[in-house]
């Protein structure tokens, strides 16, 4: 016998396999997609929150935007499809709870203002358990989160997406029928601005409306004298929005109490309702509501 490990061996005769009936496979795929369509039909507005890069506070914006919209009396849900870094449950103060299921499907966790929350974080056995999934598995999980969850009738579904324009963003654009649009999160830095331009061009590539840009960490207001400091530079978000022909929805200030609330797993919007940050989220929510509901 040759010692060459790459030598081609004569294959043993294999029993004949029946070819797969691709028509049945296609029917199964269509059935899953139809389930998503049926669930999404009961939701008036579906908004994806995206960012070109990580570390810009996208999930913080998603969570507080959801609370600000819900505070107006509208019925809101939020689905966290940032599988590798799910943080929405902690920011909404519902971390550690579990998803339940019945014969109708998966029941979401109920958060502040009655917000329906779904996240992979509810399914992980430990805090440090990684999610090691390829694109196809993530696509299937997104289908489940959209089609198997008992969302009921909602006014808004906020979709917290991972950074970048990869598999999850493409899956959402393909799976969510009549997606209302994207809110894009940035910070006032050149690196983030470049990444955001890619997100804007991605949205245009998949023919999805851009509702506007939120500039997070925009400035710092000194609590002693009220003076405003632009730590990362002034006017970068506004300039970029003008260059790309999109709306600047708002500029969220830096606030040390944001980190304190997030670390404690307490919803910032609830804990500090009178803060400049919470008031800015109310302004952003008001703009989003006017943009999407005036286009009915």
UniProtKB/Swiss-Prot annotation:
The keyword Zinc does not apply. Residues 1-23 are annotated as: Disordered. GO terms for biological process: iron-sulfur cluster assembly. Pfam families: ParA (PF10609). GO terms for molecular function: ATP binding; ATP hydrolysis activity; ATP-dependent FeS chaperone activity; iron-sulfur cluster binding; metal ion binding. Keywords: ATP-binding, Hydrolase, Iron, Iron-sulfur, Metal-binding, Nucleotide-binding. SUPFAM superfamilies: P-loop containing nucleoside triphosphate hydrolases. Residues 1-17 have a biased composition (Low complexity). InterPro entries: Mrp-like_CS, Mrp/NBP35_ATP-bd, P-loop_NTPase, YlxH/NBP35. ATP binds at residues 52-59. The keyword Acetylation does not apply. Binds and transfers iron-sulfur (Fe-S) clusters to target apoproteins. Can hydrolyze ATP. Homodimer. Belongs to the Mrp/NBP35 ATP-binding proteins family. Although the second Cys residue of the CXXC motif is replaced with Asp, the protein has Fe-S carrier activity, suggesting that individual cysteine residues in the CXXC motif are dispensable for Fe-S cluster binding. This is Iron-sulfur cluster carrier protein. The lineage of its organism: Archaea, Thermoproteota, Thermoprotei, Sulfolobales, Sulfolobaceae.
């Amino acid at each position: 016998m040759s010692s060459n490990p790459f030598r081609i061996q004569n294959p043993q005769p294999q029993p004949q396999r029946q070819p797969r009936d691709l028509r049945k496979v296609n029917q199964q795929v269509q059935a899953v997609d139809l389930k998503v369509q049926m669930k999404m039909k009961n939701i008036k507005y579906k908004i994806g929150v995206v960012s070109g890069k990580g570390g810009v506070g996208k999930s913080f914006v998603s969570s507080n935007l959801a609370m600000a919209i819900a505070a107006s009396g509208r019925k809101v849900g939020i689905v966290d499809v940032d599988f590798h870094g799910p943080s929405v449950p902690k920011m909404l103060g519902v971390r550690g709870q579990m998803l339940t299921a019945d014969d109708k499907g998966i029941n979401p966790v109920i958060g502040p203002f009655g917000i329906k929350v779904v996240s992979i974080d509810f399914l992980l056995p430990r805090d440090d358990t990684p999610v090691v999934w390829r694109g196809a598995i993530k696509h299937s999980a997104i289908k489940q989160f959209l089609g198997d969850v008992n969302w009921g009738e909602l006014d808004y579904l906020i979709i917290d997406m991972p950074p970048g324009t990869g598999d999850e963003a493409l899956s959402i654009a393909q799976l969510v029928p009549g997606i209302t649009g994207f809110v894009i999160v940035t910070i006032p830095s050149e690196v983030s601005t470049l990444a955001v331009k890619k997100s804007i061009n991605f949205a245009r590539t998949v023919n999805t409306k851009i509702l506007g840009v939120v500039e997070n960490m925009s400035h710092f207001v000194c609590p002693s004298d009220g003076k405003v400091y632009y730590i990362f530079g002034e006017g970068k978000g506004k300039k970029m929005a003008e260059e790309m022909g999109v709306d600047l929805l708002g500029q969220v200030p830096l606030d040390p109490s944001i980190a304190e609330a997030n670390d404690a797993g307490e919803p910032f919007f609830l804990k500090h309702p009178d803060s400049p940050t919470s008031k800015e989220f109310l302004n952003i929510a008001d703009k989003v509501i006017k943009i999407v509901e005036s286009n009915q």
